[in-house]
């Protein structure tokens, strides 16, 4: 089951290169709703809210080779504060240098002062009365280096002259799984209420794996759950939770209650994203200028993330959306899934602008810098040049 990322904006011969050779090759700096870039290595100096009632603390976390959730676990442990008190505006990947705002209810500035976690820096601590919620950012600034290029002067000149103003608004590989792109497959099984297949797909089905991890997944596929548990390591906490819960209740649906609700929602969201990516592919030949019947956002045609409350476009775009629903044999009411959530469906722009795009070659390194609104993927931009998603 592919992830439906097939089309390109740039008409060019793409080049091979190494992305993310070092974490410093992929810098992600969060941009606040007010437009402030949380620059790496820079103190911003956010002012405390004047009439502060002691509710929330916000702070910037700069981290190298940490994803958001793992960094948060360490900060929770260091501050001896409950996980549920924390929030963040957006998630960041691991193999990168990233900045982002965290928020916490009832935390004191002093609790952050003596934190010593390798490759994590905390600064810009601010007292405020507002809770930091998911989506509470404008977007991100990316500075990306692609290494190990072997290009002629002519090729360098050709690529340097390219200008990229917008990109297809695909959901990137991160939504489906960098190593094992199966999140959307699990989501489809959950939508179909086939929890047994969802379980085996997530815990079994080895892809791009070796050693104990490969053997553990093979054991799951054979039904040898207890043996598999002994081989899954610390990086497979969710697989272990699922298996332990299944062994306790002998119920595949019940097994998924051992996972965080956000993760269970993410499975179905990934299936919606997979279908959305296909809409982009089918719309591509018609172009992305406004057509009769389009539903627009910022004067840009949108596609639907299919859910129980989906409102279809008219015209050609509506035909595309309905064709996918019919082919997948979808019953929209079934997107209300007990114990997993109500997936009402929304709309998303099919192309998205790129802001402040710059590129340069230096010492056989191609460096890109640009800004994207929240929810958009930098790897979709780099793919326009390299053809690769990771």
From Swiss-Prot:
Active site positions, chain numbering: 93 (nucleophile)
Tagged with keyword RNA-binding: no
GO-annotated biological processes: tRNA pseudouridine synthesis
SUPFAM superfamilies, per the entry: Pseudouridine synthase (SSF55120)
Catalysed reactions, as listed in the record: uridine(13) in tRNA = pseudouridine(13) in tRNA
Annotated InterPro entries: PsdUridine_synth_cat_dom_sf (IPR020103), PsdUridine_synth_TruD (IPR001656), PsdUridine_synth_TruD_CS (IPR020119), PsdUridine_synth_TruD_insert (IPR011760), TruD_catalytic (IPR042214)
Gene3D superfamilies per the UniProt record, alphabetical: TruD, catalytic domain
Domain TRUD: 166-353
Entry's Gene Ontology molecular function annotations: RNA binding; tRNA pseudouridine(13) synthase activity
Enzyme Commission number(s) of this protein: 5.4.99.27
Keywords tagged on the record: Isomerase, tRNA processing
NCBIfam families per record: tRNA_TruD_broad
Chain's role: Could be responsible for synthesis of pseudouridine from uracil-13 in transfer RNAs.
Protein name in UniProt: Probable tRNA pseudouridine synthase D 2
Organism: Methanococcus maripaludis (strain DSM 14266 / JCM 13030 / NBRC 101832 / S2 / LL)
Primary gene name: truD2
């Amino acid at each position: 089951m592919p992830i439906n990322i097939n089309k390109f904006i740039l008409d060019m011969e793409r080049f091979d290169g190494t992305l993310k050779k070092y974490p410093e090759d992929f810098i992600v700096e969060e941009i606040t709703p007010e437009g402030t870039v949380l620059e790496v290595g820079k103190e911003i100096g956010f002012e405390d809210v004047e009439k502060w009632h002691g509710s929330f603390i916000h702070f910037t976390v700069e981290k190298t080779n940490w994803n958001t959730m793992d960094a948060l676990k360490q900060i929770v442990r260091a501050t001896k504060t409950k996980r549920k008190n924390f929030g963040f505006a957006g998630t960041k990947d691991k193999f990168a240098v990233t900045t982002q705002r965290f928020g916490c209810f009832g935390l004191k500035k002093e609790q952050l002062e003596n934190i010593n976690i390798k490759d994590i820096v905390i600064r810009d601590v601010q007292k405020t009365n507002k809770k930091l919620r998911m989506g509470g950012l404008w977007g991100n600034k990316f500075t990306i280096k692609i290494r190990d290029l072997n290009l002629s002067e002519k090729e360098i000149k050709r690529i340097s002259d390219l200008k990229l103003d917008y990109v297809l608004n695909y959901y990137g590989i991160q939504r489906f799984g960098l190593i094992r792109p199966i999140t959307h497959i699990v989501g489809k099984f959950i939508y179909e209420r086939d929890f047994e297949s969802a379980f085996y797909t997530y815990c079994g089905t080895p892809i791009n794996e070796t050693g104990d991890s490969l053997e553990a997944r093979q054991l799951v596929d054979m039904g040898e759950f207890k043996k598999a548990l002994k081989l899954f390591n610390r990086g497979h906490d969710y697989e272990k939770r699922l298996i332990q819960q299944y062994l306790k209740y002998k119920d595949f649906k019940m097994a998924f209650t051992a996972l965080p609700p956000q993760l269970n929602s993410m499975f179905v969201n990934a299936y919606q994203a997979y279908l959305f990516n296909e809409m982009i592919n089918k719309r591509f030949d018609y172009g992305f200028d406004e057509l009769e019947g389009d539903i627009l956002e910022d004067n840009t045609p949108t596609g639907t993330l299919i859910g129980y409350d989906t409102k279809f476009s008219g015209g050609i775009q509506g035909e595309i959306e309905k064709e996918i629903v019919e082919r997948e044999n979808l019953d929209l009411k079934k997107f209300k899934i007990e114990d997993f959530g109500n997936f009402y469906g929304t709309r998303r722009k099919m192309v998205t602008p790129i802001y402040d795009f710059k590129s340069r070659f230096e010492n056989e390194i191609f460096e890109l810098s640009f800004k994207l609104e929240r929810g958009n993927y930098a790897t979709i931009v780099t793919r326009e040049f390299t053809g690769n998603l990771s």
